Amino acid sequence: MGAKVEKSCVLRTTFLVKVCKHENYSQLLYVPLHAMKKYCFTLLAVLVAVTVQAQKNHNMEVAKNLDIFNQVYKNLDLLYVDTLNPGEVVGTGIKAMLRSLDPYTEYYPESETKNLKMMLTGKYAGIGALIHYHQKQKRVVIDEPYEGMPAAEVGLRKGDIVLSIDDSTMTDKDVSYVSSHLRGDAGSKFVLKILRPSTGKKMDFKITRRNIKLPELPYYGMLEGNIGYINLNQFTEGCSKDVRRAFVDLKKQGATALVFDLRSNGGGSEMEAVDIVNLWVDKEQTIVENRGKISQANHAYKTRLEPVDTQMPLVVLVNGETASASEITSGALQDLDRAIILGTRTYGKGLVQIPLDMPYNTNLKLTTSKYYIPSGRCIQAINYKRNGTGGYRERVADSLTHVFYTAAGREVRDGGGITPDVEVKNDTIPNIAYYLSASAQDSTEVMFDWVVDYLNRHPAIAPAREFHLSVEDFEDFKQKVVKSGFTYDPVSKKQLEELKKTAKAEGYYEQAKDAFDLLESRLKHDVATDVDKHSEILRQMLELDIITAYYYQAGGIEAGLQYDKQLKEAIRILQSPEEYKKLLRPKKTA
């Protein structure tokens, strides 16, 4: 038998061989090719039939559920006690459906399509100013006019209270309402009536709306030691050209190293991210690959141009609000060992959306794929897909992430965003600073009002990098805070109150009352003492607000660099060539 088998192996090359294992032995089976072909055709036919049936079942489910939705709405419209607004009811249904998927798949009714366009392009027609709701005045105020925009050109100032737009009163409206009226068609004119707190006078401004492009690159400049610095806010159309111009200009000024700041950059255009990476890596390098359910969603993006500089040392700054296209940029530069990533772990948005035109001038922004950077990893941090236990939207645990390798062999991981090569946490903002700032929901606006008053008393200040508040100025601010009656509850006090409630519910409060009283007395705060305790950060916040009012975003960023702990570490690394090179080499294993 063995000889016959051996002979067959040599002579009958048209036979296929299959190995069958059974218990403790293996048997070689020789199957004629025509029989195997018949088997394959049969298997293929079965697979096709199963696929067709599965698709048929899916289509039936779609039709069934659309019919159910249609019948539900028809009965609501026919029988519900009140008359329904079709657009509102169906729109609510659509948005509820999309909420079950991910936060990036969104429906835009006709009234909101301009918002989508602004998000995609960074452009809108309006006056070019940041506004916010003043908690004390209970009105919308001008917060920050943008440099070179209509608001700044006509003379609007920080603190001006919006009273009316043409004949429409704005005194009892929220930010969204006022913003929608400030925007309009480019070239359209309107009259804005404001109240200027410093004089108590009402003033009319005739304004012509213009196309406003949000400043995606608010500042770039030279730092100590021939190090260039570029700050990018978002990845809108054309931003790669702006970054290229800034980088070339910095090289002309003598930059021999670069800090590229992507902190709090929420992303934007994927192609712009590829073109920015292209500044520092060679042509024809794959930067990102999209993979989706349908073939049209699959695409690999490569660098298209000759680079500007492939050798200059580069540090990219990131934080927890660095997302999407920012993560493509920082992740690709990390995977290609072209830059040191410094800061804190990024947001972790590895999903790609496309805008789709829908009937009746509506739009749908739809997640169609995940993106994968050069090492092959996807950095999506949250799993939005429902699992078998009914849970969803769970952050990928570090223990479930997978190891990938950079071009030089450094270990990196997928899931959970981009982990920096050098982790540096910025100092946290104390509770009192949050409640004093205008961003706090229940802010007394005392900090905002003091800054507005300072601006009115000082028609000019020193250059951005040189300006500092005097001791007398800060003391005046502290007295204003104390006299305003400002108070706040530290987190520790709130947690103590929760602990008291729990102790009472469980019956332990009375026996522990003395301990609670002692702890409460220790946690009491004095506002004046707290202002002194946190004077450094409060002084910085005041100075940056004032500088931004005089020198716009560029001035505020420039002045803030002197306080930037992460930037200082980036500069130190760039000034240490051996440490920089070591960070880009794989770690030696024992």
Residue ranges and their predicted role:
Residues 1, 5, 9, 13-59:
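Bacterial Sec-dependent N-terminal signal peptides
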Residues 53-65, 69-86, 141-145, 149-158, ...:
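Cleft-lining beta-strand/loop regions that shape enzyme active-site pockets
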Residues 80-141, 187-209, 214-219, 561-571, ...:
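Extended, small/polar residue-biased N-terminal targeting/export presequences
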Residues 107, 287, 301, 379, ...:
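Short clusters of hydrophobic/aromatic residues that line enzyme substrate/ligand-binding pockets
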Residues 127, 306, 365-367:
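A structural signal for short loop-to-beta-strand junctions that line the ligand-binding cleft
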Residues 325, 337, 342-344, 348-410, ...:
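Polar, glycine-rich mid-to-C-terminal structural blocks
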Residues 378-590:
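Conserved functional hotspot residues or short segments at active or partner-binding sites
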